[in-house]
Amino acid sequence: MNFSSKSNESSKKVVLGVSLVVFAVFFIYPLFFVVVNSFRPNADIIIKPTGLPVKMFLGNYVQAWKEMQFPRVFLNTLMVTVLGTGGIIITSAMCAYGLVRSEWKIASVLYAFFAFSLVIPFQIIMVPIGVLAADLHLMSVPGLIPMYWGLGCPTAIFMFHGFIKSVPKELEESAAIDGAEKFYIFFRIVLPLIKTIIATVAVIDALWIWNDFLLPLIVAKQGTIQLAQMRFNGQFMKDYGPMCASLTISSIPIIAFYLALQKYIIKGIAAGAVKG
């Protein structure tokens, strides 16, 4: 009986291990394909897309760097990502804190409003967003920043709300008795206690903003990394080599950021869901 149960357990582990390997290969192969082809001439890629480079060809990186004007679009994208993510975190954390600690009944209605907005697809509101951006003279790269604040806050508020509810109110009351003001309590007591969910929101929103294509296409038209990569996708000819090189270069910063904070993602989402 024990032998049978151990055998079944071993079989399950083998199946699980094989499944994980298959899924890992499935997700890693596209990245491997892009990196390998970034070192191959465009003619070789067209003839044999899945081949390996005969020798290291760095011309794709030189072409991508020049044609994309990479330093400029990189700084633009970095500015939008940092300011957009930072604004979402500060605004959403303060809003969620106000909703959690508010004694007004309308607070629950406002929270339900934010939660409901999560189910609205972006494609439904992208035309009104374009019209609004034009009316507010936000049709530029800096104009993307307040747009991301508005689009990213509902999800962040939902995540912060569940986490802030777990913060003991007695800590805030003790600080208030000692004369601490609301802003001091929020920034010095509440925020340090929710740093896990802050890191989670930072990673999720940074990945979203850095990789976003549709909103910059509607609002900015040009000036970000994702839009600059369109120049390699012509109507009659595609420069696969420089395209792969540009994808490789642009992926390095956000992958490094994700790897640095990845441990907070599952921890923060799981804790926020349970505490919410």
Positions of predicted regions on the chain:
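A structural signal for multi-pass alpha-helical bundles of membrane permease subunits
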Residues: 3-276
